[in-house]
């Protein structure tokens, strides 16, 4: 299956012909993906509102997980 979105040939992380990540790339897009690499664990990817915790990258995924309610 697809590893990345082939729709954008300008993406340096994704091979538009095969829809696969380029060699050495961990990710192609996402709040926790920067320059084709996962952002380090603990980096805030979504600032919380109210009593919620800030959402932080896991270091293992390009997605920004919902970290949940504080308290």
From Swiss-Prot:
Disulfide bond residue pairs: 4-19, 6-14, 13-36, 27-33, 32-57, 45-64
Query: Is the keyword Zinc in the record?
Result: no
Going by the UniProt record, its keywords in alphabetical order are: Cell adhesion impairing toxin, Disulfide bond, Hemostasis impairing toxin, Platelet aggregation inhibiting toxin, Secreted, Toxin
**What Pfam families does the entry give?**
Disintegrin
Spell out the subcellular localization from the entry: Secreted
Q: What else is known?
A: The disintegrin belongs to the medium disintegrin subfamily.
Q: Which PANTHER family match?
A: ADAM A DISINTEGRIN AND METALLOPROTEASE DOMAIN, DISINTEGRIN AND METALLOPROTEINASE DOMAIN-CONTAINING PROTEIN 28
Family, per the entry? Answer: Belongs to the venom metalloproteinase (M12B) family. P-II subfamily. P-IIa sub-subfamily.
State the protein's name: Disintegrin ussuristatin-1
Origin organism is Gloydius ussuriensis (Ussuri mamushi)
